[in-house]
Structure formats: C-alpha cells, structure tokens
Amino acid sequence: MGLAVAHQLARRGASVLVLSRRRSEAAGFVAAGMLAPHAEGIGGALLRLGQASLQRIPAWVAEIEADSDLACGLRPCGIVVPFTNATERDGYATAAWGTALDRSGLEREIPGIGPRWRAGLLFEQDGQIDNRRRLMRALERACVQRGVQFEEGSEVLELITSHGETSAAPAPVSAARSAAPARAAHPARLEAVRLRRADGSELELPCRTAVLAGGAWSARLLPQLPVVPVKGQMLSLQGPIGALPRVVFGPGTYLVPREDGLLVVGATSEPEAGFSEGLTPCGQRQLEQGIAALLPAASHWPPMERWWGFRPCTPDEGPLLGPGPIGGLWLATGHHRNGVLLAALSADLVARGISGEPSPGDGEQLEAFRWDRF
C-alpha cells in the first residue's frame, strides 16, 4: 500500500521519502494477488470500493508498467466460487454479479474439481495479479524512476505534533459517538517523526505531511487505530501450465494459478496468533485438506514454497482511509484481505486528497472509511 501511494504522489510531482522498517514485512509480498470483490462475497461500501478499484486496475497497472518497464502479471482470468448445492449458490451475497453454474458447468470451468461441489458462480470480471514476483518489484522500480527515495531499515518510533504531543499517548475514547463525531477545534498538527535507522542512530525528521501505511503494525504507532493482525499461512505447488484456467475461491482455501503453472494456495485466518511468526502443522494441514477437496490432482504436484504474513484487520474488515487523528497525517491501512485489490483506488484517493485535487465522489468514499467510524 505504501508503494502504491508513494508512486501516485510522485506522479503528481510530490517529493516522497519512504521509511520502511523491514521490506519483507509488507503484505504485498505475502498475499495471493486475487482481485475478487465479487468472489469474496463482500457487500455495502466495501463492495463498492472494491468494484471501483477493480475498474481502475488496468490503467493503474499500465502506469506502473510504463514507469518501470516491467510487467506486473495482471490476469483477468475470472474466479469460480464452488458450492455444495444450488441453494447456497443462489443465496450468496454477490450472486447477482455472477454466472450460475451446475455440476457440468463447474467441470467445464475447473477440470478436475472435487466431487463434493455441485454448483458454482463464475465471476468473469474478477481476476488476479502476480504481486509477489512481479507487481511489487515493478512498483518499487516505478517509484525509483519517479524520484521516490527509500530508507530501508528505518523504523518510525513517534509522530511529533505542534502541541508537543507524541503518538505514544492514545487519544481518549468516549463512551458513545454520534454518526458524525465532532473534530477537535484546533487539532494537533504533524511537525516531525522520530525514527531509528538501521545503524541504531535516532533522529527527528521534519515532516508536515505523512501517510501511515504500516499494515498490521499501524496501531503500534497510533494506538487509537483499531487495527489488529490476522495471521495467514500459504503455500505453493508447481502444476502443469494451463492445468487450472481460473482462480478457485473455496470455503477456507483458494487456488490461484499463475501463467507458468505455479499454484498459490491460501490461506489460514488466525486472529488468535497475534504477531506469532512461523508455520504450524495445523495451518499447513488445513491448506493441504483444502487442496484435496477443491482439486484432488493438485495434491500430487511438487511443493515449492511455504510462507506466512499478517493481514491488517479492522472491526468491519474495511480499510482506514483519509485524514488521520493528527493534522497532516493521512491513513492508508487496515485493508485486511483486499490490500492488492484496493491498492489502486486507495492510492488515488490519498494522493488526490494530499495534492488538493479530489475527484467527484472522493469525499463520500473517504467518509465511509474514516478511522473513527466505529
């Protein structure tokens, strides 16, 4: 998310510095890259945000590819959601956007699909992008080509404001809030950030405008943000090229086929794990059982990688976008399962807001995902 925002700001002529504690922590290097607002079965404002971002993605990818001279691996391959019966299929939250499939339709779209699945929905408008191997690398190069500077290994410790406060002190929480909570008459403004560099030295960096895109770690810097980590484990297999033509989004497991036959399999959802690192036998077994149920033949494909990461989750699983609790601080975090999907529009919304060039409808979208909406 941080790279996407940095790139859009740089394209608008801003001078951008990215402070990154550890590049490998970014969820963009962990996610499967599904572009699935319909297959996920989400609703309301989050669905509308996802649909709008999905429409923006082809042009967004074209901008990244033009600036980086690298392919991003975008594939509008469609996604199939299987069900055990037609009643479940017809009651799915986003069924109106899909094509109903019976068993023969499932077998046509997903050759070799497991026998328990009797119905399905095909969302041809959904797809995937190869984020781990292509998109993130292209975004980094696009940022560099646009003049973005990077400080890898630099951890932001505090946000220092004009009131002499720091982000280490949580904001007071009222017992109740109205639908449109009042803002402070004279909110503190961002003046600087205190950071620790890779060599252990600490300094204050003057800064009047910043974007917090800290993912699952965002609340460590701003405790009033309702963002918690949800651990996810994944694995990949090497299958034959073309063996699986579409993404399969099953209950608890999804299969994402890359063009070269690599099959990305995800993902566990472990809110109880906190920031506990590492793979677990239980988590890997869950993925293997999901593979066997969805595409039995894939259980015999050679294993390639196993990894884990942390999703930034909010109480309603929607992102925190727009102005934050400190003047000059913007938020682009809390995207949970949909960070790759929502990156295109989230980056636009934040970059346009900071640049003072909002488009019609931006205010409504940002209002729906205010940090203090809960």
Model-assigned labels for residue ranges:
Residues 197-249, 277-281, 297, 361:
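Central helical "cap/lid" subdomain
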Residues 48-52, 86-87, 122-141, 278-283:
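Short beta-strand to alpha-helix junction loop
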Residues 10-29:
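Glycine-rich FAD pyrophosphate-binding loop
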Residues 132, 301-374:
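C-terminal catalytic lobe of FAD-dependent flavoproteins
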